[in-house]
Amino acid sequence: MSKISNSGNESKNTLYCSFCGKSQHEVRKLIAGPTVFICDECVELCMDIIREENKSSGVKVRDGVPTPQEIIAVLDDYVIGQQHAKRVLSVAVHNHYKRLAHQSKSNDIELAKSNILLVGPTGCGKTYLAQTLARIIDVPFTMADATTLTEAGYVGEDVENIILKLLQAADYNVERAQRGIVYIDEVDKISRKADNPSITRDVSGEGVQQALLKIMEGTIASVPPQGGRKHPQQEFLQVDTTNILFICGGAFAGLERIISGRGEKTSIGFSATVKAPDERCVGEIFRDLEPEDLIKFGLIPEFIGRLPIVATLEDLDVNALMQILSQPKNALVKQYQRLFEMENVELAFHEDALRAIAKKAIERKTGARGLRSIMEKILLETMFELPALEGVQKVVISSDVVDEKARPLYIYSERAEDKENVSA
């Protein structure tokens, strides 16, 4: 009977980990807190989670400021080509960090920010660069669409909504939001509707440019605490936009014609000079961009003045699109291969198939943005049939499949072939 009572006392005195439930005899170490215990295995698991989160932040920070080389190295993992634009962005973000660090130490010289304008043809990676940048920096980052903005008082979003989104990205921490970065996409869509100022009100064009001037330069923006419409009785959060870095991007369709025709004099008659059309690609023409071209396009001079750095992006050729399909960490080919892996099937693309897909995207003039729709069309029937098929081990895509001259090649496992022979 004494043995039973001793074992009962032992079980009462045994300590257990509050997280995994293991006893002190099953682990090497049990650490005691005020009311809880944690074992060495759970501590190690917590450390692994923290290490993984630190890795996913992407940019290694040295003395609090990531170098341009460190930023561009991470961008290179996701974005193919566009080295000039990546250099501009990495230097701008690096200087943004430095400016914030400088302000906390000294007030003798005020460092002004240099907002950026990204100009490039559609599908060349402007928006994707900004999205990738958002993943790798540790300051609040938000993206806004200029096409949804209108002047205050009209149906649509006010420009203050951009600051509200940044505030939400900072978990309503005003101090962190004031150190953030804003990317405004489709900024070419808010250009003035005519070269000359109009008598009628342009609430979604020039009016939005006028409204953006102050927040881009620096002002105290009044933002509703939890979003929604402004009410007179509502208390607002005051956000200083002086240190917020603004990056704007747009395709500027038709701007190449303005650049090519710059300085031309119109003449008629038999003695008129006939100039051959500019055969350069859009990206090459954009390299000759001047502020006066943007003014002629429809941006007001004050708005252009708030964007001192202009970075032009290049057209993507066949080789660049082939690399985009297969090389980046989240390349389209890798994404579809992962989808097929879930069906225990290997997906393979011939090099000529990737070239044919790239050529189709160039013919459609959609750039990298059009690659997914082409891939979906190629693989639609296969993705429909595959879950119902047994024994498919590999699917091979050739250039004939892309050109709709053949079906994808299905390679079956030996077991599936044996079953077919037996049933026959």
Swiss-Prot record:
Binding site for ATP: P121, T122, G123, C124, G125, K126, T127, Y128
Keywords: ATP-binding, Chaperone, Metal-binding, Nucleotide-binding, Zinc
InterPro entries to which the protein is assigned, alphabetical: AAA+_ATPase, ATP-dep_Clp_protease_ClpX, ATPase_AAA_core, Clp_ATPase_C, Clp_protease_ATP-bd_su_ClpX, ClpX_bact, P-loop_NTPase, Znf_CppX_C4
Superkingdom: Bacteria
Keyword Chaperone in annotation: yes
Record keyword Membrane present: no
Gene Ontology biological-process annotations: cell division; proteolysis involved in protein catabolic process
CC terms in the record's Gene Ontology section: HslUV protease complex
Binding, Zn(2+): C17, C20, C39, C42
Domain ClpX-type ZB: 5-58
Family as reported in the entry's similarity comment: Belongs to the ClpX chaperone family.
Functional description taken from the UniProt entry: ATP-dependent specificity component of the Clp protease. It directs the protease to specific substrates. Can perform chaperone functions in the absence of ClpP.
Subunit structure: Component of the ClpX-ClpP complex. Forms a hexameric ring that, in the presence of ATP, binds to fourteen ClpP subunits assembled into a disk-like structure with a central cavity, resembling the structure of eukaryotic proteasomes.
Protein name per its UniProtKB record: ATP-dependent Clp protease ATP-binding subunit ClpX
Protein source organism: Bartonella tribocorum (strain CIP 105476 / IBS 506)
